[in-house]
Amino acid sequence: KTNSIFLDGYICKTPIYRKTPLGREIADLLLAVNRPYGKSDYIPCICWGRNARFASGFEVGEHVQILGRIQSREYIKKLTETETQKRIAYEVSVSKLECVEE
């Protein structure tokens, strides 16, 4: 059984680089992957460590390829002052990424 994904797409939002309270480096990417008929999928990706440092230099429009796995996590969405809802987010945890020279 395996959970692996390969994506070939374009950075569509400036990467967000930060450090966790424990000092781990992390970068959030949003990748646009083109589909037939002029449609695109927008896939959130998360990078750690060296990959996060590398990804932090990406610019919008840059062509990249990503290898990773799909992961899910639960979070609490605040709907009103008193109301919350448990939700699930899915994202790609990146193990390898590279720029594609056009």
Where are these regions (language model features)?
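Single-stranded nucleic acid-binding surfaces, predominantly the OB-fold ssDNA-binding core
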Residues: 1-102
